UniProtKB/Swiss-Prot annotation:
GO terms under cellular component: extracellular region
Listed InterPro entries: Spider_toxin_CSTX_knottin
Residues cleaved off as propeptide: 22-25
Protein name: U6-lycotoxin-Ls1e
Keyword Secreted: yes
Family of this protein: Belongs to the neurotoxin 19 (CSTX) family. 06 (U6-Lctx) subfamily.
Keywords: Disulfide bond, Secreted, Signal, Toxin
Signal sequence coordinates: 1-21
UniProt organism field: Lycosa singoriensis (Wolf spider)
UniProt-annotated location(s): Secreted
Tissue: Expressed by the venom gland.
Amino acid sequence: MKLLLFTALVLVVISLIEVEAENERACIPLEKECTKTPGNCCSGLRCDCYRRFEQGVAKGIQCWCIEKDVTYKGV
């Protein structure tokens, strides 16, 4: 019985620590890079990714936090 209560207490403490760490995580603001953390843009923003080319050769993917429902077109 004591082992069961101790296990439950440990699980509760671990889950509280995880929730607190997630709440303290700073969001990524508008027009900042989100390549490594695509789900971490601030509220009202989305992470949009583009494949970068140099002289026709793919050089990787770049992602940026941009406003939702906004579409950018090349000029």
